[in-house]
Amino acid sequence: LMKKFGRFEIIGETRDDAAGEAFDKAAKMLNLGYPGGPAIAKIAAKFKPTSYNLQATIYKLPRPMINSGDYDFSFSGLKTALLYQLQKMASKEIKEKTPALCAEFQQAAADGLVSKTIKAAQKFNAKTVLISGGVAANELLRQTLAEKLKKEAPKISFLSPAPKFCTDNAAMIGLAAFQKSRRKSAFKSWRALRAQANLRL
C-alpha cells in the first residue's frame, strides 16, 4: 500500500513461491523453457475451449488461499497440483493437452492475484491499483484485473506499465535509491552504505 511516493506498507505477500517463480517452475515441468510466464501465456493462447473440451472440467487446478480472509498469496500448492496432474498423464497426452494445462494454470494464478488485489483495494480505500514486475506483463492478468475492477470497484482506477517495462531492471532500483537519498534522514554518506541482497522497500 503506497500512501505517497517512497512510502510503502506491506499488507499482503506470498507465503512461499512468488507468482513469477511458480510460472517458471510450471514451464519447466512442461518443458516450455525460460522465462516461464511468456512461454505459458503463448501456449495457453492456443487453447480454444469447446463444448467437448471444457477447460474447467478437464484440468481444474486449485486457487490457493483465495478465501483465506487476508491479503497473502500462495502458489506452491498450485504448482504442486500441476505436478500431480502431470504424473497421472502419459507423455503423449501431456503433449496434446499442454495448451489446456497452460490455460488453466495461468487462469488459476490470475484468479488468486486479482481476487486478493481487489479485496485489498476496497478494504483500504485505494484510489488506484498499479501492477508491476515481471508477472504484470501477463495479458490475461492485466485484462482480468482491469475488467473486474471496472465491474466490482468502478471508482478505483487501474494503471499498468507497458509490458516492456514490466521487468526487474537497474533503472527502477536507481530511482528508488535517488528518492531515498533526497530524504535527509535516509543516510549520512554513500561511503557508509552496505549491499543487502534482501533489503526491503
Where are these regions (language model features)?
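Acidic, glycine-enriched active-site microenvironments
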Residues: 1-201
